Amino acid sequence: MMATYEGRYTDAQALRIAVVVARFNDLVTGKLLSGCLDCLARHGVDTSSNSDQLDVAWVPGAFELPIVTQTLALSGQYEVVITLGAVIRGDTPHFDVVVAEASKGIASVSRETGVPVIFGVLTTDTMQQALERAGIKSNLGWSYGLQALEMGSLMGVLRSATSAS
């Protein structure tokens, strides 16, 4: 018989979540973080300053996201890690280098640790595009929060299913 595995948004109280936020372009990343925290709070995650369920780490920029994400994932304290950043194209190839290394690094953390890592790094051509995605039109931070809840729950379901068989 075929098994179907899905994560739910209602298992939030059982999750420990880390959010790693790039400070560079903090006008954008701060809005992403606000949207993310709003989503998590509305789904039952304690987002208060004395929360035992959520930690937020700030890094200088998107390039530094992978190393801190890896450290948190390897700690064994979190079911899911969310990364938030904003890389905006400029006049030099720097954009391409930062985006490539951040995305490869973040993806490898998830594969190597088995901890879901949500890729919440905006890559846009202009500040206007980034702001539109961080709250002017919609806030993708909310979506990243939902993805974290779903993946954290799904991994719990999968671990239970595979340990029972």
UniProtKB/Swiss-Prot annotation:
Cellular component terms per the entry's GO annotation: cytosol; riboflavin synthase complex
GO biological process terms on file: riboflavin biosynthetic process
UniProt: (2S)-2-hydroxy-3-oxobutyl phosphate binding residues: 91-92, 133
Gene3D superfamilies assigned to the protein according to its UniProt record, in alphabetical order: Lumazine/riboflavin synthase
UniProt catalytic activity: (2S)-2-hydroxy-3-oxobutyl phosphate + 5-amino-6-(D-ribitylamino)uracil = 6,7-dimethyl-8-(1-D-ribityl)lumazine + phosphate + 2 H2O + H(+)
Pathway membership: Cofactor biosynthesis; riboflavin biosynthesis; riboflavin from 2-hydroxy-3-oxobutyl phosphate and 5-amino-6-(D-ribitylamino)uracil: step 1/2
E.C. number: 2.5.1.78
Active-site residues, as the UniProt record annotates them: 94
TM annotation in the entry: none
Pfam families: DMRL_synthase (PF00885)
Disulfide bond residue pairs: none
Binding residues annotated for 5-amino-6-(D-ribitylamino)uracil, in chain numbering: 24, 62-64, 86-88, 119
Gene Ontology MF annotations: 6,7-dimethyl-8-ribityllumazine synthase activity
Alphabetically ordered keywords of this record: Riboflavin biosynthesis, Transferase
Role of this protein: Catalyzes the formation of 6,7-dimethyl-8-ribityllumazine by condensation of 5-amino-6-(D-ribitylamino)uracil with 3,4-dihydroxy-2-butanone 4-phosphate. This is the penultimate step in the biosynthesis of riboflavin.
PANTHER family: 6,7-DIMETHYL-8-RIBITYLLUMAZINE SYNTHASE, 6,7-DIMETHYL-8-RIBITYLLUMAZINE SYNTHASE DMRL SYNTHASE LUMAZINE SYNTHASE
Family named by the database record: Belongs to the DMRL synthase family.
NCBIfam families assigned to the protein according to its UniProt record, in alphabetical order: lumazine-synth
Protein name: 6,7-dimethyl-8-ribityllumazine synthase
Biological source species: Prochlorococcus marinus (strain MIT 9303)
